[in-house]
Each structure stands twice: as C-alpha cells, then as structure tokens.
C-alpha cells in the first residue's frame, strides 16, 4: 500500500488529530447483499457498504454526518428533546452506547433502540412525543422513526445518485 500523505512519509506515523476515528455504522442486518441500493440496517448506500474499509476518515465522516442528519430529522419530526442533560444522564446510567458527537435526537434514537419497551414516562428520560404520534407505543414510534430514516436515505440516493447513474448510462450508450 502506498502512502501519499507527505506528513506520514516524513515521520513514518499518521498525522495526529483530535477527531475520533469513525466506526462502521453497520448493525449486522445488511440488505444491500439482496439487492437494496440503501441498506435497511445502517442506511448507507450499497457502494458505501462495499468500499467502507477503503474510505479515508474524512470520507467516513462525510457519510456519518449525512446519516446523523437524516436520523435527527426523522426523530425530531416525532419527538422533542426537552432536557438534553437528563437524556444524556439516562443514556450513561443505562449504559446505552451513543455517539457524543451526534446531536441529542440521534441519542434519543439510541435510547429507543435499547429500551423503548421499558420506558413508561418519556419525560423522565428528557423527551416528549409529539401529540400526533402519542397514540403509538414507543416501540412502534421507534420503528416509524427508523422507517423515516430509511426513506430519507433512499430519497437522497434516488435524487442525487440513481438519477446521475441514469444519465451516465444514457451517455455511454450514445
């Protein structure tokens, strides 16, 4: 493997950074292997799943930021974080893994993934459910948020990648 970064070549070590390495968002239920363009598990695009280990940290960070933005948007559409510190305290107390660099709506989704069936009073966890979604159980709410997250990722893929591929294919046929 060739190292092109002159800072690495001169010192023999990778450049120091204060940024944490981006971990794979894979959750072990990949649907790209059965033909989906967007994974139903982690919501990455199929080419991102395939090439993830070859991505630079900046490329991984770009994907991570897009995913966290979509998840936050899907979650904020149905819930409001009313006490960020309480939510974070509950995550820490319950030993729920979350990325501190993501916003509180991503944290909330991690809480719902870990314990939606055990939460009877969302206010004690620092959030409330919007009235239009209050008739759902937190498990159903979590699943709806996850579905919205996938829809946002799929719409982004369809708008910015699949459309480009259509035009590229047409140009190649001419």
Question: What positions do the PLM features span?
Answer:
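Short cationic/low-complexity microdomains
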Residues: 126-141
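Metal- and O2-centered redox machinery and metal/ROS homeostasis
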Residues: 158, 164-166
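N-terminal cysteine/histidine-rich coordination modules
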Residues: 2-76
